[in-house]
């Protein structure tokens, strides 16, 4: 008689764990959309996704852990999206423009997640994952510096310290997107960044071109 092989349950279990984790993060984002970062709570998350208190604590420890985990998930998603646009660009001008439009397009496509990044940053910076935030921000910045350096050496961009380049290129689009996200409704609402996509990209290139 052929022996029966008991199917492994590790993959489904892992998938279920991942799904539950994501359910909790989605619920936390929904809380933040309704009332800001301060509205994220264990009870609020539990009510929205049906996770047990034990499950929430198992995955994230506490409310601060949920906020930080959601922040880093969104932060890394944004970084990957912008990096993909930069990698696809051909030439320094196209690359500079891709940094701006990649960031802008990501924000416009998912404003709730983008708003959470701005809102939660100070809370994460003041919490136990401060070193993780510093490391993630530094890693992203250093990747941009490394991209600009050969172009600076080749004379394609201004002969400025490359550590300044990310601020010159990304500063304006980040500032406008932040202002737009802070008040998307009412008579004082700003025009969507999508309308100024070309202007912001062109301004970034003018700021650094040789």
Placement of each model-derived feature along the sequence:
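Amphipathic alpha-helical packing segments from all-alpha helical-bundle domains
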Residues: 76-84, 127-154, 163-167, 175
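C-terminal peripheral helix-coil segments that are non-catalytic and often amphipathic
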Residues: 1-8, 105, 138-153, 172, ...
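Amphipathic, non-transmembrane alpha-helical scaffold segments
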Residues: 17, 67, 71, 75, ...
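Amphipathic alpha-helical segments used for helix-helix packing
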Residues: 108-128, 178-182
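Hydrophobic alpha-helical connector segments
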Residues: 69, 83-113, 165-169, 197
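Helix-turn-helix
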Residues: 20-23, 31-65, 69
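Generic hydrophobic, amphipathic alpha-helix propensity
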Residues: 20-28, 45, 70-74, 78, ...
């Amino acid at each position: 008689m052929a022996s029966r092989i008991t199917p492994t349950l590790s993959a489904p279990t892992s998938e279920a764990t991942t799904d539950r984790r994501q359910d909790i993060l989605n619920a936390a984002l929904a809380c933040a959309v309704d009332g800001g970062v301060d509205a994220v709570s264990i009870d609020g998350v539990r009510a929205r996704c049906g996770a047990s208190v034990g499950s929430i604590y198992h995955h994230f420890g506490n409310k601060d852990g949920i906020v930080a985990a959601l922040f880093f998930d969104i932060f890394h998603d944004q970084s990957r999206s912008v990096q993909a646009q930069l990698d696809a660009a051909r030439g320094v001008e196209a690359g500079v423009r891709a940094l701006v439009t990649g960031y802008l397009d990501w924000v416009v496509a998912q404003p709730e997640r983008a708003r959470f990044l701005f809102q939660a940053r100070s809370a994460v910076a003041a919490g136990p994952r401060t070193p993780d935030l510093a490391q993630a921000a530094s890693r992203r910045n250093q990747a941009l510096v490394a991209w600009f350096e050969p172009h600076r050496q080749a004379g394609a961009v201004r002969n400025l310290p490359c550590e300044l380049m990310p601020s010159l290129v990304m500063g304006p689009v980040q500032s406008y997107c932040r202002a737009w996200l802070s008040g998307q409704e009412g008579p004082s609402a700003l025009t969507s960044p999508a309308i100024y996509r070309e202007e912001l990209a062109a301004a970034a290139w003018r700021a650094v071109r040789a």
